Amino acid sequence: MNSKFIVIEGLEGAGKTTARDTVVATLRAQGINDIVFTREPGGTPLAEKLRDLIKQGIDGEVLTDKAEVLMLYAARVQLVENVIKPALARGSWVVGDRHDLSSQAYQGGGRGIDINLMTSLRDTVLGEFRPDLTLYLDLPPVIGLARARARGELDRIEQESLAFFERTRERYLELAATDSSIKTIDASQPLEQVSESISQVLKQWLTSRETA
C-alpha cells in the first residue's frame, strides 16, 4: 500500500499520545513498519523554536491572534516541505500529532479569526496538500481541561477560557461533519474503548484503501 499521512487531532487532554500508540500498533499489525512521527507546531529546528514562542510567549510580550496564526503556518510549511513530503516520497507512512485542522479549529474557532482568512492561509501555504486520514478525538472541553491540569503546568494556550475551547470544539465538529477524511472518535469513553474505536476505524479505512 502506498505511503499515507495520518493525523491525530483533538483538544487538550483528548489522549492524542495514547491514540498515536494505538495507530502505530494497528499499522504494524498490518505489516506497516516504516513510520515517521511528527508534531505541530514543531518537527524541524525552526519549527521547534516557533513552537516555544507560541506555547510560552517571550518576555511578557502580547502575542496577537494574527501573529500567532502566521507563526503556526510558518512552522507548518517548514515541517511539510522538509519532513512530511520527503518521508511520503520515499515510501514512509507519517503519523502526525496535529496538522492544519488544529489551526482551523483553534484560531478560526477559538480565536474567531475570519474563516476566509483561515482558508486563504491554508490554500496559500499548503496548496492541495492534505492528510489522507484525520482521527479527531472529541470530548467535552471541561473533561479535557481537567485532564490537562492534572498533568501539571499549563502552557499559554492551555490557560485559555472554557469558552475558548467550547468554540474550538464546535469548529472541529463543523469541519468533521463536512469532510469524509475526518473520522470522529468519542474520546470521553474509557481508555480501552477509545483505543478499540481508533483501531476499528483505522482497520476499516485501511481495508477500504486496499479495495479502492
Curated annotation (Swiss-Prot):
<dbReference type="GO" id="GO:0004798">
    <property type="term" value="F:dTMP kinase activity"/>
</dbReference>
<feature type="binding site">
    <location>
        <begin position="10"/>
        <end position="17"/>
    </location>
    <ligand>
        <name>ATP</name>
    </ligand>
</feature>
<dbReference type="GO" id="GO:0005829">
    <property type="term" value="C:cytosol"/>
</dbReference>
<dbReference type="InterPro" id="IPR027417">
    <property type="entry name" value="P-loop_NTPase"/>
</dbReference>
<comment type="function">
    <text>Phosphorylation of dTMP to form dTDP in both de novo and salvage pathways of dTTP synthesis.</text>
</comment>
<dbReference type="GO" id="GO:0006227">
    <property type="term" value="P:dUDP biosynthetic process"/>
</dbReference>
<dbReference type="GO" id="GO:0006233">
    <property type="term" value="P:dTDP biosynthetic process"/>
</dbReference>
<dbReference type="InterPro" id="IPR039430">
    <property type="entry name" value="Thymidylate_kin-like_dom"/>
</dbReference>
<dbReference type="Pfam" id="PF02223">
    <property type="entry name" value="Thymidylate_kin"/>
</dbReference>
<keyword id="KW-0067">ATP-binding</keyword>
<dbReference type="GO" id="GO:0005524">
    <property type="term" value="F:ATP binding"/>
</dbReference>
<keyword id="KW-0418">Kinase</keyword>
<keyword id="KW-0545">Nucleotide biosynthesis</keyword>
<protein>
    <recommendedName>
        <fullName>Thymidylate kinase</fullName>
        <ecNumber>2.7.4.9</ecNumber>
    </recommendedName>
</protein>
<keyword id="KW-0547">Nucleotide-binding</keyword>
<comment type="similarity">
    <text>Belongs to the thymidylate kinase family.</text>
</comment>
<dbReference type="InterPro" id="IPR018094">
    <property type="entry name" value="Thymidylate_kinase"/>
</dbReference>
<dbReference type="GO" id="GO:0006235">
    <property type="term" value="P:dTTP biosynthetic process"/>
</dbReference>
<dbReference type="InterPro" id="IPR018095">
    <property type="entry name" value="Thymidylate_kin_CS"/>
</dbReference>
<keyword id="KW-0808">Transferase</keyword>
